[in-house]
From Swiss-Prot:
Native source species: Acetivibrio thermocellus (strain ATCC 27405 / DSM 1237 / JCM 9322 / NBRC 103400 / NCIMB 10682 / NRRL B-4536 / VPI 7372)
Name of the protein: Uracil phosphoribosyltransferase
Family: Belongs to the UPRTase family.
Single GO term (MF): GTP binding
GO-annotated biological processes: UMP salvage; uracil salvage
Biological classification of the source: Bacteria, Bacillati, Bacillota, Clostridia, Eubacteriales
Keyword GTP-binding: yes
Main enzyme class: transferase
Length: 209
């Protein structure tokens, strides 16, 4: 698998197991998604550029490093991607947040756009697209294409569980985009859901069916 980083940290793997459990209730599910997103955020931001600066401490001067380079942006794919935002903002409180609303047509399994609101300086930012489940890959690919059409040149995709089909679609259509996930499952069912997966992430986050 090209450009795919599967995070095997014990805390992430433990929390993913709890997410998969059908008995995990909405409140705990929501908390787990936020916690996993924050843990994954450490790896997604690992290669952020740094520059040396001098900082005056209470007792002297220290040469240390601060983040430089492009500012960050976070773009959740509505609605399930919203559950990942808070965890990322705990790491990146100054990041701007855009929203892309897509739903999957139940007949064709193709993405349908219904909402988009992005920061005016989106093209100047390094963007992390948030989508808990990379199933067919259609919605994520459409969101990435939408961002590129608006001048974004640096995009990463962060998801909790990815399918092999979804990974292939992103690799084929956006070979420049790095994919970060916590688990890879083999199959999709006839409705486009990842098997074994964790069910409908949006429904489990928001208590809907």
């Amino acid at each position: 698998m090209n450009n795919v980083f599967v995070m095997d940290h014990p805390l992430i793997q433990h929390k993913i197991s709890l997410l998969r459990d059908k008995n995990t209730q909405t409140k705990e599910f929501r908390e787990l998604v936020s916690e996993i997103s924050m843990l994954m955020g450490y790896e997604v931001t690992r290669n952020m550029p740094l520059k040396e600066v001098e900082i005056e401490t209470p007792v002297g001067v220290a040469r240390t490093k601060v983040i430089s380079g492009k500012k960050m942006g976070i773009v959740p794919i509505l609605r399930a991607g919203l559950g990942m935002v808070d965890g990322m903002l705990k790491l990146l409180p100054m990041a701007k947040v855009g929203h892309i609303g897509l739903y999957r047509d139940p007949e064709t399994l193709q993405p349908v756009e219904y909402y988009c609101k992005l920061p005016c300086d989106i093209a100047e930012r390094e963007i992390v697209v948030l989508d808990p489940m990379l199933a067919t890959g259609g919605s994520a690919s459409a969101a990435i294409k939408y961002l590129k059409e608006r001048g974004v040149t640096s995009i990463k995709l962060m998801c909790l569980i990815a399918s092999l089909d979804g990974i292939k679609k992103i690799n084929d259509e956006h070979p420049d985009v790095l994919i970060y996930c916590a688990a890879v499952d083999d199959k999709l069912n006839e409705h486009g859901y990842i098997i074994p997966g964790l069910g409908d992430a949006g429904d489990r986050l928001f208590g809907t069916k």
